[in-house]
C-alpha cells in the first residue's frame, strides 16, 4: 500500500521538511473580521503578527473545509496513493479533525485515516514527521498509528502567554473560566493541552522569568524519568531572540536533549496572542524510528 501523509499548516513544517518527507500540507484559514487569510498562502507569520498589532478586533480561527480536503484527496488518488493518513492539530482547538473523521468513509478510492495530535505547532510536526518517515520506510498504516499514539502520550506542550484575551475570545479555555478574567494583566498565564487536547490553565507567575522557571522544572522532571532520548522544541510568537536565548540555556543544562526552536504560526497565534513563549517536549522521534527499524531487521 502506498501511504500519503497529510497535515495542516499549524504544524509549521518547513518547505524543506515537507519535501524531504513527502508530506502534503493544507493551509489553515484564520479570520480578521470578515477577511479570511490562509497560512503560508496569503499571510506569513511575520505579516500576521504585524497585522495583530494594528487590527482593532481580535482575530478568530476557522477550519479547512471538506471541499478543500476532497481536492487534496483527489490529487493524492491521481498520484497513485492507496491510503491517506491525516495528522492534524488538536480537536480541542479546531473541529477539522473530527469533521474529517466523519467525512473520511465517504472518500472514494482511498482509505483515509485521521489522527488527532491533541497538540499543535512542533508537537504536531514531530508526529507528522514520524508518520511520514515510517510511511516511506514501508510500515503499515496500523503500525504507524500505534507509534503515533505512543509519541502523543509522551508529548507535553506548555505555553506562557501575555494575556488570556485571545483564548477567551475564541472560546478555547477548558477550565478555570473564572480565573481567566483575572489574568488579563500583570501576570504570565501558563497554559497546556490536557489529555483530550483541550487548552487548560496550569497557573500564573508574576514575571516571564518565573514562568520560564516553572515550565523548566516540569520539563526537568520528564527528562529525569525518561529512559529514552528526549526532544525539546522552544517556540515563540514573534519573540525569536528570547526563544533562542532560552534554547541556548536549555542546551547547556540538558546536553543529552535535542533542543530545537520554532515559531508559533498564525493559527495558534490567534489563540496565544503576541509574545507567547512555549516548550514542547516528547520522546525524540528519530531514535524511536531507528529502534523500530533495528527491531524490524532482526
Q: What are the residue ranges of the model-derived segments?
A:
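N-terminal glycine-rich anion-binding loop in soluble enzyme alpha/beta folds
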Residues: 4-63
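Short beta-strand segments
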Residues: 6-7, 86-90, 116, 282
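Mixed-charge interfacial surface used for oligomerization/domain docking
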Residues: 10, 14-24, 29, 100-104, ...
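Short, solvent-exposed amphipathic alpha-helices that sit
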Residues: 44, 96-100
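Glycine-rich, highly charged phosphate/nucleotide-binding loops
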Residues: 62-72
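Short, well-structured alpha-helical segments in soluble
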Residues: 72-79
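Short glycine-enriched loops at secondary-structure junctions
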Residues: 89-96, 117-120, 187
Amino acid at each position: 500500500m502506498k501511504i500519503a501523509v497529510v497535515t495542516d499548516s499549524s504544524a509549521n513544517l518547513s518547505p524543506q521538511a515537507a519535501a524531504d518527507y513527502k508530506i502534503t500540507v493544507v493551509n489553515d484559514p484564520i479570520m480578521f473580521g470578515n477577511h479570511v487569510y490562509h497560512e503560508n498562502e496569503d499571510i506569513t507569520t511575520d505579516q500576521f503578527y504585524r497585522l495583530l498589532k494594528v487590527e482593532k478586533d481580535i482575530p478568530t480561527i476557522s477550519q479547512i473545509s471538506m471541499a478543500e480536503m476532497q481536492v487534496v484527496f483527489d490529487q493524492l488518488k491521481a498520484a497513485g496513493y492507496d491510503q491517506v493518513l491525516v495528522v492534524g492539530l488538536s480537536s480541542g482547538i479546531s473541529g477539522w479533525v473530527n469533521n474529517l473523521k466523519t467525512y473520511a468513509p465517504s472518500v472514494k478510492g482511498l482509505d483515509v485515516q485521521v489522527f488527532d495530535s491533541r497538540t499543535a505547532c512542533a508537537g504536531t510536526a514531530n508526529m507528522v514527521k514520524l508518520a511520514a518517515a515510517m510511511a516511506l520506510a514501508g510500515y503499515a498504516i496500523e503500525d504507524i498509528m500505534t507509534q503515533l499514539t505512543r509519541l502523543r502520550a509522551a508529548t507535553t506542550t506548555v505555553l506562557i502567554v501575555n494575556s488570556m484575551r485571545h483564548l477567551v475570545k475564541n472560546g478555547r479555555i477548558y477550565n478555570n473560566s473564572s480565573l481567566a478574567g483575572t489574568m488579563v494583566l500583570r501576570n504570565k498565564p501558563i497554559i497546556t493541552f490536557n489529555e483530550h487536547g483541550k487548552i487548560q490553565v496550569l497557573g500564573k507567575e508574576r514575571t516571564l522569568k518565573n514562568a520560564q522557571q516553572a515550565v523548566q522544572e516540569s520539563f526537568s522532571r520528564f527528562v529525569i524519568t525518561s529512559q529514552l532520548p528526549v526532544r525539546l522544541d522552544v517556540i515563540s510568537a514573534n519573540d525569536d531572540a528570547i526563544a533562542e536565548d532560552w534554547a541556548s540555556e536549555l542546551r547547556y543544562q540538558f546536553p543529552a536533549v535535542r533542543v530545537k526552536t520554532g515559531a508559533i504560526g498564525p493559527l495558534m497565534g490567534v489563540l496565544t496572542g503576541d509574545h507567547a513563549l512555549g516548550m514542547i517536549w516528547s520522546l525524540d522521534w528519530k531514535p524511536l524510528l531507528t529502534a523500530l527499524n533495528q527491531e524490524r531487521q532482526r
